[in-house]
From Swiss-Prot:
Matches recorded under InterPro entries: Cyt_b/b6_C (IPR005798), Cyt_b/b6_C_sf (IPR036150), Cyt_b/b6_N (IPR005797), Cytb/b6-like_sf (IPR027387), Cytochrome_b (IPR030689), Cytochrome_b_C_euk/bac (IPR048260), Cytochrome_b_N_euk/bac (IPR048259), Di-haem_cyt_TM (IPR016174)
Binding site for a ubiquinone: 201
Cofactor note: Binds 2 heme b groups non-covalently.
Official protein name in the record: Cytochrome b
Organism: Eliurus ellermani
Other remarks in the entry: Heme 1 (or BL or b562) is low-potential and absorbs at about 562 nm, and heme 2 (or BH or b566) is high-potential and absorbs at about 566 nm.
Ranges that cross the membrane: 33-53, 77-98, 113-133, 178-198, 226-246, 288-308, 320-340, 347-367
GO cellular component: mitochondrial inner membrane; respiratory chain complex III
A Pfam family reported for this protein in Swiss-Prot or TrEMBL: Cytochrom_B_C
């Protein structure tokens, strides 16, 4: 008799995706982050659902409803902080996942990579709208500043901004629609994740060497299920430590002040995971130029498959490009630091140099290094 997991129409799909999936025998712990992102998404949807049961998306009651969740709802404080810090974990895993794709040349699976970029944009949009919901000072002013960027679009900009706001400023209509979008987007993300996995399983996983691994495959279960469980336990340990010991470590104190349209906070800064993009935005004096640089800072990832000049896929055997890669990582950390600093000397010039370096490494230096390495290794 055939095993039910191999014959049942639904279980068969799960079996081919998570159980009998042929996986390369040498994929390292950097490949754990895909499953960790799945866990983060499930956690965010679960905690978000319980928060939505008690939250009210009205400007007069939004702030106090969040306070009510933390004070009066059973374990409401835990759910709220798991959700807030879960977002930070989500982005840590996202950045490592993308970074791993860049390092090992996984972007050569173009469909999977492009789907991943769409997912990154969707998660960033969801996180931004979620940050507006508690209706604190930083929520309100963050929403005002970021949505206002769309007014830089020629001709239709102002109309577009007012259409998104549902009025002439960020108000009740804006909050209500942001809540609606914040609720629906994670489910759209789940659908996109399925497409992402569908594309991935068409080609199979990449591996650290960047070489074809068809001749050396092992079943996903039990080898990588056990390996993933270890990753999940470490992630949960880190998240729970953060939630129970320093839940406000990554937040902004300004968000504990109810939104006041008449009082601007001294420094408007987004959550830490957007600071690198915010620094790139601020480093260009022109409004439209800044917005374009902001979008391109993520969209530039879509160019990676077309900028790949080396005959070797992975950076494992390419020391010159490896060096550039780690300079890029340091540059992104610098941008993250600059994004949280006030707009004054020397931070302005550091931000501008770091922004130029970011685009230069990806668009110029890495493709050049690939050609140099091919020459040195006599790959042609």
């Amino acid at each position: 008799m055939t095993n039910i997991r191999k014959s049942h129409p639904l279980l068969k799909i799960i079996n081919h995706s998570f159980i009998d999936l042929p996986a390369p025998s040498n994929i390292s712990s950097w490949w754990n982050f895909g499953s960790l992102l799945g866990i983060c998404l499930i956690l965010q949807i679960a905690t978000g659902l319980f928060l939505a049961m008690h939250y009210t998306s009205d400007t007069t009651t939004a702030f106090s409803s969040v306070t009510h969740i933390c004070r009066d709802v059973n374990y409401g404080w835990l759910i709220r902080y798991l959700h807030a810090n879960g977002a930070s974990m989500f982005f840590i895993c996202l950045f490592i996942h993308v970074g791993r794709g860049m390092y090992y040349g996984s972007y050569m699976s173009i469909e999977t990579w492009n789907m991943g970029i769409i997912l990154l944009f969707a998660v960033m949009a969801t996180a931004f709208m979620g940050y507006v919901l508690p209706w604190g000072q930083m929520s309100f002013w963050g929403a005002t500043v970021i949505t206002n960027l769309l007014s830089a679009i020629p001709y239709i900009g102002t109309t577009l901004v007012e259409w998104i706001w549902g009025g002439f400023s960020v108000d009740k209509a804006t909050l209500t629609r942001f809540f609606a979008f914040h609720f629906i987007l994670p489910f759209i993300i789940v659908a996109l994740v399925m497409v992402h996995l569908l594309f991935l399983h068409e080609t199979g996983s990449n591996n650290p060497s960047g070489l074809n691994s068809d001749s050396d495959k092992i079943p996903f279960h039990p080898y990588y299920t056990i390996k993933d469980i270890l990753g999940v336990l470490l992630l949960l340990l880190f998240l729970i430590s953060l939630v129970l010991f320093t839940p406000d470590l990554l937040g902004d104190p300004d968000n504990y002040t109810p939104a006041n349209p008449l009082n601007t906070p001294p420094h408007i800064x987004p959550e830490w995971y957007f600071l690198f993009a915010y620094a790139i935005l601020r480093s260009i004096p022109n409004k439209l130029g800044g917005v374009l640089a902001l979008i391109l800072s993520i969209l530039v990832l879509a160019l990676l498959p077309h900028l790949h000049t080396s005959k070797l896929q992975s950076l494992m055997f390419r020391p010159l490009t490896q060096t550039l890669y780690w300079i890029l990582v340091a540059d992104l950390l610098t941008l993250t630091w600059i994004g949280g600093q006030p707009v004054e000397y020397p931070f302005i010039i550091i931000g501008q140099l770091a922004s130029i370096l970011y685009f230069a490494i990806i668009l110029i230096f890495m493709p050049m290094a690939g050609m140099i390495e091919d020459n040195v290794l006599k790959m042609d």
